[in-house]
Every structure is written in structure tokens, then in C-alpha cells.
Amino acid sequence: MCGIIGFMSRKKRMIKGDKIALALDSLKERGNGKGSGYVGYGIYPTKYKDCYAFHILIDNTPKFEKIKVEVENVLEQYGTIVKDEEIPTEDGIIEKTQIPWRYFYEVDEKFADREEDVVVDIVMEINDKIDGAFVISSGKDLGVFKAVGWPDEVAKFYRIDKYEGYMWLAHARYPTNTRAWWGGAHPFNLLNWSVVHNGEITSYGTNKRFVEMFGYKCRLLTDTEVVAYILDLLMRKHKIPVEYALSALAPRFWDEIDKMPEEERELHTAIRLAYGGAMLNGPFAIAVGTPQGLIFMNGDIEKDTTMFGLTDRIKLRPLIAAEKDDMIFISSEESAIRRICPDLDRVWMPDAGMPVIARPWK
């Protein structure tokens, strides 16, 4: 159930959206037409590159204008709307129950010391308090495009082929525990974190309570939402190195920890004890993308793009990785990768619970 695909150019070459749409369409049998979505990084390279790009879905009802004003009132409390417009779409492809709107936005200078926290607060306030609107992406130079529909329908609806990005993630949904609606489609995004997920997170209740202790609010009725918030908490707010943050999500088994060298054993024990509420149980495979985030790697701080994939500790959901020149791919199935890149340099199956981490070349 569910199909995921992601790729990144480590040279940061711009790649048209028709590539990700074609790859996801080959995974459509893993979904059931009840949700598909895409996220592109680097899609706003012009004068809005340094603005937060809020993609917001607003109910397509007679209350649309009223809801839109409520959204703008929240935004204007904390900063300036530089530009806003309806996201271009094609008519007659899917039922347009939501109107996708985007705001290019600058946070007020008085919040400069906590700018990203303010953006998170805005997202939580809109999703929690405004009936009929929800934020689907809120990062810089990126955008999420999702809806109820098959992969090719959603791609045509949003004109994905008109966008170019250096990294793309996409998802074909097969909902099992919640109803199909636009907000429940993947990817899930917060700031520069974007998550696509195949499987079921049976620990959702525990994970939800854990992030809510830190002010996050889960309102989109699906387990994947909480993963984006956990990543933001661990890596942005708590500044935990990416490998150790992912170890909190899929920690080593206790018998493995017992066999580690002392320093490593103490570290993994501390992660399990301090971040037990972040541990994901159940069968899952996730792919995550983020640019411009502070990622601690081997003691060094990098401010650049990172894409990674991760499965549960016994790999109950598939995840395939591949490389070709500067390109790296992550997918549920090798066939989706070969649909857009038939001649690969390397293909491998990541070990259970072990991440694949891709960074741009320098």
C-alpha cells in the first residue's frame, strides 16, 4: 500500500516536474486514487526565493472569501504578504473541493531571532483555529501540490510539468485508517521538512502526545503528519545530528545496543531514554527532503539540502535506492526509478532501520 518516489540532483541541476509525475504514475497500483502529491525544491528561484511560500488549501464554498480573510489576518499579525495568488490549475481534471492559494511571505524583523518558530506558530494557528483552511507547505523555495486523485490527475491538475526543481518527492496514497481528503494526501510539510510515507505508524498516539508537549498540533487526520513535526523538533529545535535523530525514530534494539562499544552504547541508550516518544512503531518506509536546514554531520554544521530514506527496524515496507551520475533516487519499487532513468550506475536495498542520506556535491 502506498507508493513513494524521490530524487535529487547532487549538482542541484533543475529537473522538470514531468519526470517525477512519470515515475509516480508507474506506482499508481500501490494507491487507489484517493490521494496523490508532489513537492519540489528550488521551484521559486526568482525574486521570491527568500520568502516563505505558504501553500494553503481553502474550502471551495461560498465562505471562501471569509476564510481567506481569516488566513490573511493571521499572516499579517507576524509579517508582510509580499504577493498572493491562486495556484494555477487545470479545470475538469478532478473535483475542485479546495482552492489552492499561495502567499509569498516575509516575517517581521522584530521576530528575527525566532523567525522559523513564528512560521511554525502560524501553521499551527491556521490549521487549528480556521475552519476551512489548512497549510500544506510553508518553506522557502519549495512547494507542495496535493489533492484527492490519481498521480497523473493531480500532476495535470497542478501543471507539475511547468515547474523545475533540483529535488522532488512524490506519493500515491492508499488510505486505510482515515478518510480520503486533500489534507490527508502526502507529502506532509513543515518549514523545509517534507515527508512521504508508506505503511502504518501504530505508535501515532504516543508520537502525537510527544510532539504536542512541545506545542505542535496534529490536525490533518493521518499518522504521517507527526513525522514532519518530530523531525523539526529533533533536528531544528534540539539540533540533534541527523543520524542520531533518525536513530530516535528507528532506534537500535536493546540487544544490539548491549553489544556496542561503551561510548556508542551510552549514546544510543540516552537516545532511547530521552526520545522514547519519538520512536516510530509499525511497518513503514519514509523519504524526507529538506533544504537550508542546520544539519549536524560528524561534528560539522552544514547548511544545505539533504534527502534521506528510512524503513522500520525489520523492513516490513520496501525501500530501494539507486544512483546515476549526480542523481540519487529513493523509491518503493525499482521500476519507478527505471521508468525515468533506465541505465543506473548502482541499485541497492538499504538495511532495515538504516537511513540513506544524500547531500549535494560541493
Curated annotation (Swiss-Prot):
The keyword Nucleus does not apply. Pfam families: GATase_2. Keywords: Glutamine amidotransferase. Residues 2-362 form the Glutamine amidotransferase type-2 domain. InterPro entries: GATase_2_dom, Glu_synth_lsu_1, Ntn_hydrolases_N. The keyword Transcription regulation does not apply. The active site is at residue 2. This is Uncharacterized protein MJ1351.1. The lineage of its organism: Archaea, Methanobacteriati, Methanobacteriota, Methanomada group, Methanococci.
